[in-house]
A protein has these predicted regions:
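A small/polar active-site loop signature that marks catalytic segments
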Residues: 1-74
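Short glycine-/small-residue-rich flexible loop motifs, especially phosphate/cofactor-binding loops
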Residues: 28, 77, 99
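Short, mixed-charge aromatic SLiMs
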Residues: 18, 82-94
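Hydrophobic alpha-helical segments
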Residues: 34, 67-70, 83, 118-122
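Envelope-exposed proteins and targeting segments
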Residues: 2, 39, 111-114, 123
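Short, Gly/Ser/Thr-enriched beta-strand-loop segments that form substrate-interacting elements
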Residues: 90-121
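Active-site-proximal beta-strand/loop segments in catalytic clefts of secreted hydrolases
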Residues: 6-10, 44-46, 79-80, 105-106, ...
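Active/binding-pocket-proximal capping segment
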Residues: 70-87
Length: 123
């Protein structure tokens, strides 16, 4: 529900339309600016729960990579949880340095998923 409200607010603030369509318009614009094909992101709602949402996994990986190099990438990366933080509070990753991770967890229909970053000691 919060994600849906944020998506609509993004549309209102940036596209002048506080709706899912306004959010979609801004998302498409941003993806294009990032050099990605907006058609690879099929967004039906703002919360990500609709089975009509479709994202090409390799394009999601490209977006994560591009955001890591974006001038505001640190803000984006720091919005992800880590082990013991936020939604990552219950996650115990079997890594030598788990604090070098940032991730978003997901769970629906008995399926668990993680997406995010694992950093090396050199960045």
């Amino acid at each position: 529900m919060h994600a849906e409200a944020l998506f609509r607010n993004l549309g209102a603030q940036m596209a002048g339309e506080g709706s899912v369509e306004g959010g979609k318009a801004m998302e498409r614009k941003f993806l294009g600016e990032m050099g990605l094909n907006p058609d690879d992101f099929k967004v039906w709602d703002g919360c990500g729960l609709s089975p009509k949402n479709k994202v090409v996994p390799s394009v999601e990986t490209q977006l994560l990579s591009k955001m890591a190099r974006h001038p505001k990438g640190n803000y984006y990366i720091n919005s992800f949880a880590g082990p013991g933080l936020g939604t990552g509070g219950k996650r115990q990753l079997d890594l030598p340095y788990p604090w070098l991770t940032r991730f978003k967890s997901g769970f629906i229909g008995e399926v668990h998923a993680l997406v995010g970053y694992i950093f090396t000691m050199n960045g």
